[in-house]
From Swiss-Prot:
Name the record gives this protein: COP9 signalosome complex subunit 7a
GO-annotated biological processes: COP9 signalosome assembly; protein deneddylation; protein neddylation; regulation of protein neddylation
Source organism phylogeny: Eukaryota, Metazoa, Chordata, Craniata, Vertebrata
Coiled-coil positions: 185-233
Gene name of this polypeptide: COPS7A
Family: Belongs to the CSN7/EIF3M family. CSN7 subfamily.
Length: 275
């Protein structure tokens, strides 16, 4: 596995400055250096240069075509045209394979090993995993190798150069995304409105309960004060009423005792005469 590299624009800027004044064979050589340079994975600015486009109609048309394959294509595209394109160095092969993984990751985030092995023309899983680890170290993608399920799970990947014919599809995708955002926003606003209504209802109910509690407290307070006032007007009279029994009760009790006594004395007298 090669040393760790990071995707930066520093090397690319240097190549762009050199390419502005280069032509012919010198420019073709510079393009091959760009394709091999670590950390350079976008080539759109280089392709847009007029002197680079002139290569398409020159003896170095194959170099220009190779540059377009690195910008927009995959390793399978290169193999399909390999007879008409310059040979690749090992570093160029790995870079184009990295870009091919990025293209696959743009379509699906869980890529089976079998798909990768075929797309990258690799012989075994060990080579595939080494290539993916190298791409991760280069910050081309982030993810994990699921060896149990034999697949690559991609969390992030860099963007690739965009062709002009792809702009309409991108605009359509963005338009659909905007429509989806509007639908989500409308749903959120509706939920917020319902939440505010529920909040107002609960506040009204709370105020009503607090008002009823306050009125109840006032009623209890007034009733208690009135009872206390009534008790404190003549406390001695109130105590007397509690201590003295009712007049009707006192009159009935002695009469009962008297009748019982007379009955006993009368019966005694009758018993004496019989004796």
């Amino acid at each position: 596995m090669s040393a760790e590299v990071k995707v930066t624009g520093q090397n690319q800027e240097q190549f762009l400055l050199l390419a502005k004044s280069a032509k012919g064979a010198a420019l073709a050589t510079l393009i091959h250096q760009v394709l091999e340079a670590p950390g350079v994975y976008v080539f759109g600015e280089l392709l847009d240069m007029p002197n680079v486009r002139e290569l398409a109609e020159s003896d170095f048309a194959s170099t220009f075509r190779l540059l377009t394959v690195f910008a927009y294509g995959t390793y399978a595209d290169y193999l399909a045209e390999a007879r008409n394109l310059p040979p690749l160095t090992e570093a160029q092969k790995n870079k184009l394979r990295h870009l091919s993984v990025v293209t696959l990751a743009a379509k699906v985030k869980c890529i089976p090993y079998a798909v990768l092995l075929e797309a990258l023309a690799l012989r075994n899983v060990r080579q595939l995993e080494d290539l993916v680890i190298e791409a991760v170290y280069a910050d081309v993608l982030r993810g994990s190798l699921d060896q149990r399920n034999q697949r690559l799970e991609v969390d992030y990947s860099i963007g690739r150069d965009i062709q002009r014919q792809d702009l309409s599809a991108i605009a359509r995708t963005l338009q659909e995304w905007c429509v989806g955002c509007e639908v989500v926003l409308s749903g959120i606003e509706e939920q917020v409105s319902r939440a505010n209504q529920h909040k107002e209802q609960q506040l009204g109910l709370k105020q009503q309960i607090e008002s009823e509690v306050a009125n109840l407290k006032k009623t209890i307070k007034v009733t208690t004060a009135a009872a206390a006032a009534a008790t404190s007007q003549d406390p001695e009279q109130h105590l007397t009423e509690l201590r003295e029994p009712a007049p009707g009760t006192n009159q009935r009790q002695p009469s009962k005792k008297a009748s019982k006594g007379k009955g006993l004395r009368g019966s005694a007298k009758i018993w004496s005469k019989s004796n």
